[in-house]
């Protein structure tokens, strides 16, 4: 998804939303009224006016107060998604948190925040230190992979690591990348970086 012009991935956990900004390479937590703003405005694509009116009516708060909160939310969201967060004090983004804090929250809630999938055991090298010992040639199918992505998304996973063997040897690797993007995961690759993709 794109937030304020920057690519991001998110997962909604009900009481909080965790967003990963590709531009700033940081996580941030959105909760309470900010989570409602995010759902109504960003996810449901409603106008600012609609969101302010709806929240005002729902909580019996003046629209001017909700409007101020909404403006603070959008300013914080813009700063959190922006690459400039890397160059400034992350605390100024208000929403940005340390990765260790995210993992601690997810552990408390028993959420598998990250997952590793070995999509193939095929490799283009024969390293003596490798646990594989001898070559195999099995691959996940695209259908099985998509089912796994759906299940991981439902469990609350946001980060996905692909490994193998060598993941680039998988004949459907590009299909897998499209599926990962479709379901909004943050991707990490473990590769030997010798394969000509």
Region roles according to the model:
Residues 1-40:
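Acidic, low-complexity/disordered tracts enriched in E/D and polar residues
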Residues 3, 21-23, 54, 133, ...:
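Preference for short coil/turn "hinge" residues that link or interrupt alpha-helices
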Residues 4, 22, 45-46, 89, ...:
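Detector for Asparagine
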Residues 26-115:
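Long, charge-rich, low-complexity alpha-helical segments
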Residues 58, 72, 76, 90-197:
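Conserved alpha-helical substructure of the radical SAM core
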């Amino acid at each position: 998804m794109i937030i304020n012009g920057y690519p991001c991935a998110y997962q909604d956990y009900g009481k909080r939303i965790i967003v990963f900004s590709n531009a700033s390479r940081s996580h941030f937590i959105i909760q309470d009224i900010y989570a409602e703003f995010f759902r109504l405005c960003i996810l449901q694509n409603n106008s600012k006016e609609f969101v302010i009116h709806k929240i005002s009516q729902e909580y019996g708060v003046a629209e001017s107060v909700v409007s101020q909160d909404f403006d603070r939310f959008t300013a914080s969201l813009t700063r959190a998604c922006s690459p400039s967060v890397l160059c400034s004090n992350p605390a100024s983004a208000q929403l940005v948190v340390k990765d260790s804090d995210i993992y601690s929250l997810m552990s408390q809630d028993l959420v598998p925040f990250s997952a590793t999938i070995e999509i193939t055991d095929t490799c283009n090298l024969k390293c003596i230190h490798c646990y594989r010992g001898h070559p195999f040639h099995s691959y996940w199918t695209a259908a099985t992979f998509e089912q796994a992505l759906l299940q991981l998304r439902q469990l609350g996973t946001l980060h996905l690591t692909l490994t193998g063997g060598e993941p680039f040897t998988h004949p459907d690797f590009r299909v897998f990348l499209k599926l990962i993007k479709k379901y909004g995961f943050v991707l990490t690759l473990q590769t030997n970086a010798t394969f000509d993709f």
